[in-house]
Amino acid sequence: MDIKEKIEELRAELHRHNYNYYVLNAPEISDKEFDDKMRELQDLELAHPEYKDENSPTMRVGSDINKNFTQVAHKYPMLSLANTYSEGEVTDFYERVRKALNEDFEICCEMKYDGTSISLTYEDGKLVRAVTRGDGEKGDDVTDNVKTIRSIPLVLHGDNYPSSFEIRGEILMPWEVFEELNREKEAREEPLFANPRNAASGTLKLQNSSIVASRKLDAYLYYLLGDNLPCDGHYENLQEAAKWGFKISDLTRKCQTLEEVFEFINYWDVERKNLPVATDGIVLKVNSLRQQKNLGFTAKSPRWAIAYKFQAERALTRLNMVTYQVGRTGAVTPVANLDAVQLSGTVVKRASLHNADIIEGLDLHIGDMVYVEKGGEIIPKITGVDKDARSFMLGEKVRFITNCPECGSKLIRYEGEAAHYCPNETACPPQIKGKIEHFISRKAMNIDGLGPETVDMFYRLGLIHNTADLYELKADDIKGLDRMGEKSAENIITGIEQSKTVPFERVIFALGIRFVGETVAKKIAKSFGDIDELRQADLEKLISIDEIGEKIARSILLYFSNESNRELVGRLKEAGLQLYRTEEDMSGYTDKLAGQSIVISGVFTHHSRDEYKDLIEKNGGKNVGSISAKTSFILAGDNMGPAKLEKAKKLGVTILSEDEFLKLIS
């Protein structure tokens, strides 16, 4: 596998994990594994700037936006924090701050509570809006649900607060409430929540506020924004906020030295296990707001803060058996079934084994005592075997299966890949259902009223066997089914009918062609007039398209070489989907930026970064991630990074403001 293919593979993998984490609330890997993959991708992109892509996961924050809520723009971008698991990197952060400020400073150390982020807006002492983090620039308005959380004041105490301000924090589900909720779900034979974070996030997105109220969510607030804040100190502002009625952690501490910072980290690395809520690290912030402003931001995170993540906990337990799960792409994942063991405050009974190489490397046998970790405190995995605990009665060696556990097809393994795949795309149940779930998702066909449970029911009843079958459903076919009244049935049919107006690029993405994500789908839609042109394209034509390499091109060719796929696309075409480029799709396209490479940097007022990327592409320009002598100009918002500014000046690259850019393309 060459470097470009490795970068593309990591991007595709991280995009998938972002979606699972932020949209589905169903993470497949731990925080640490995600961070490690992200860091690997960042290192590769840094070493190979020729493959930089503004749509790379390294350039985004992630999203938890839900189409069932109104989306609201954040007045101040809600950025994520840079993460580290290393004390050495904490020292590096401290030294960077010291050198940049060249004056005395304090570090505010706070518990990193493991819940779901929220932004609360107060006007004249009353709560007027509660918005999730979303993609950092806009989030879901969940005000009604947040008003059910008793630790969040609806009306403030006193009268010395600003007339309008924003306060941010974390919505949490205490361990005790989480465990009781899972006991209730288990009794009803419903899927359990993986952890309190998922439970809090899922609860906040419920449509029924009375159920939200019953879940007993809690909240800690940790940052004030706005004009006329009472103090320059972040810590001091939090103490004032506590007087107004906000729940502020009393564990927060101001540190004068790096030694004090490490004392705080080391103490809570042990004592956090005794807290009533989940934590996964310590947040370090420069205390002075003036100094924070001077340090500024990168595109993704503030330079004045960092999150130190605690190392994973480990426990020893017995391996009872290994089962296998099949995903949408046919990837087969081995799962270890274990004796129940307490780990990071939850009971662990299953752990991921990832792939055949991991199983072979561990030399696993049934009955082995194995070490289980929860990297980043979420997904358990087996990291080792206590071979000294083996008796002379060694259990059966675990060998990766050769046939699909769902349909019996012989598994295959693509060159250069660790996973095994079931090739039976059109008749393997988990693949069929997974493809339909991808097809109906928000970023694809966005079909209202349909979700995984409904898809599963329709499939079990034989109503659908592929995505094209959706367009043959009638309201009479589905009304009267379990929890499916006449109104619900009509809403689903209406949603399916409305999806016929979804533009060509999203239909291409919805097809689920391997390695064809949103960005590649856009490139394809711009390069081909309709699906027939794409189907007839050869390798040479495909790889001539910007950002489509041989790996993606061969995947497209493989997809259309399958007769079942060609038949499916034909049926979708007959159903009336937009498998062609319309004049509306191409409206707004110009060549005003043709041949120009443009870097976006900073925080913007008029449009989001993604909207500016679209404007650049629609006007014939190319988004690039790093500044070089070939850069045509930089579109700069507020808080442009000083390193980029210095490099631009050194290379003589033009810097345009938002207004100048909009005038240029008008």
Swiss-Prot record:
BRCT domain ranges (all copies): 588-666
Annotated GO biological process: DNA repair; DNA replication
GO CC annotations, alphabetized: cytosol
Ranges in a coiled coil: none
Q: A single Gene Ontology molecular function, please?
A: metal ion binding
Q: Does the keyword Cytoplasm apply?
A: no
Residue numbers binding NAD(+): D31, K32, E33, F34, D35, S80, L81, E110, R133, E170, K285, K309
The cofactor named in the record is: Mg(2+); Mn(2+)
UniProt-listed InterPro entries:
BRCT_dom, BRCT_dom_sf, DisA/LigA_HHH, DNA_ligase, DNAligase_adenylation, DNAligase_N, Hlx-hairpin-Hlx_DNA-bd_motif, NA-bd_OB-fold
Q: What is its EC number?
A: 6.5.1.2
Per the Swiss-Prot or TrEMBL record, the active site comprises: K112
Q: What class of enzyme is it?
A: ligase
State the similarity comment.
Answer: Belongs to the NAD-dependent DNA ligase family. LigA subfamily.
Designated name of the protein: DNA ligase
Q: Which organism is it from?
A: Bacteroides thetaiotaomicron (strain ATCC 29148 / DSM 2079 / JCM 5827 / CCUG 10774 / NCTC 10582 / VPI-5482 / E50)
